[in-house]
């Protein structure tokens, strides 16, 4: 082999080695589509099912790695089934968590009988996602309440068990999640965006003891970004030491925001960039 050909071969081999060394970073970008507050079967949202069908098509066009559905799926078990049938059209794997319209103060048993676990974790590439049931952290059955309604002993016990599980995960994180970007998702956020919502009722956020306990353990887990819904308003803000990525609803608007979904792009350094994709 001539020196010229040898140099060319070495250059090609060097390029290939560099490509394979960098390929985990080149191809590692994670995209998560977030659909929230679909409210199938709600009287005030007569176009909810049609809107969800449109969103499924729009999500598929963007080819995310996974799709998360962050609560308020439907108003009754039959509506859950309708929502799931529509969401079967998604090409990516779908992960669900409940909202306050799915799980009420009587507990998550019905939800679990249809969707399985209401809190868990999953991994996609280098990202670990903690999917949480915010309905175990408060009582959102009374929209008009000016003080936080009491939680039942059963829900308190369930909430304590979820937070204990997170605490155990935090202790084991160095062993199991080394090098992982860790994010969380839940329906009701813990914090307000300054004065928004400008309604002082406790309905809009996790309050009191459970807010403090959850935020403490999520920080120990290394969570900086939390995906949430509930407000029907797409926005990103910082509060409580976290960046909150709030998805718009697909069904109806509470505060005049546009309907649509969120698309989150996560890079290996932990940066989460959110794009809102709106229905026409």
Annotate each predicted stretch with a short phrase.
Residues 41-43, 74-79, 101-107, 137-143, ...:
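Active-site environment of divalent metal-dependent phosphoester hydrolases
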Residues 57-66, 146-244, 273, 279:
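His/acidic metal-ligating clusters that form di-metal
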Residues 1-13:
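Bacterial N-terminal signal peptides that target proteins for export
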Residues 24-82:
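N-terminal active-site segment of His-dependent metallophosphoesterases
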Residues 29-42, 126-140, 183-185, 243-249, ...:
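Active-site-proximal beta-strand elements of phosphoester/diester hydrolases
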